[in-house]
Amino acid sequence: MDYFTLFGLPASYTLSLEQLAVRYQDLQRQYHPDKFASAPAAEQLAAVQHSATINQAWQTLRHPLTRAEYLLSLHGFDLASEQHTVRDTAFLMEQLELREELDEIGQAKDDARLEGFIKRVKALFDTRQQLMVDQLHNESWEAAADTVRKLRFLDKLRSSAEELEEKLLDF
């Protein structure tokens, strides 16, 4: 059973996080291992396994990138374990330039410049994420997989920038 079915939701990138959370809580109440404490060992084990599956599904579906990766896996694109990389030279050059800029900002300890950088990376991420949403909606799986690969780069860059921001604030 796929995670969307487990939560009683359509297999779609766009979903209600509120509805997902409600279903998660319902399933956790229903299958929590403590409810099976006096049951036979086989039922206890099944409850633990089902609870673990529910938790994994929750973690996967609540985050946009992992939800997209999972949806693509249902259509034959296993991005989580693939060795495929981005081949878009212009995109890769842009990433190198952004990484260099982030390094310069860190060396200069320039809070204002970092704030603008984070906003710019977020805008790049949001634009590409909307492209991915359109590709998933149109069932352009190959194009969506490529966009997810690029979103991973931007997500890591955003995380690095936010880590630098925390470091500069602590300084």
Swiss-Prot record:
User: Which InterPro entries has this protein been placed in?
Assistant: DnaJ_domain, HscB, HscB_C_sf, HscB_oligo_C, J_dom_sf
Q: What does this protein do?
A: Co-chaperone involved in the maturation of iron-sulfur cluster-containing proteins. Seems to help targeting proteins to be folded toward HscA.
Alphabetized Gene3D superfamilies for the sequence = DnaJ domain (1.10.287.110), HscB, C-terminal domain (1.20.1280.20)
| NCBIfam families hit by this protein | hscB, PRK05014.1
Task: Give the protein's recorded name.
Answer: Co-chaperone protein HscB
Sequence ranges assigned to domain J in this UniProt record = 2-74
Supply the alphabetized keyword list. Chaperone
Q: Family per UniProt?
A: Belongs to the HscB family.
What does the record note on quaternary structure?
A: Interacts with HscA and stimulates its ATPase activity. Interacts with IscU.
Respond yes or no to whether keyword Chaperone is given for this record. yes
Listed GO molecular functions? ATPase activator activity; protein-folding chaperone binding
Q: Does the keyword Chaperone apply?
A: yes
Pfam families in the record: DnaJ, HSCB_C
Question: One GO CC annotation, please?
Answer: iron-sulfur cluster transfer complex
Any one Gene Ontology biological process term?
Answer: [2Fe-2S] cluster assembly
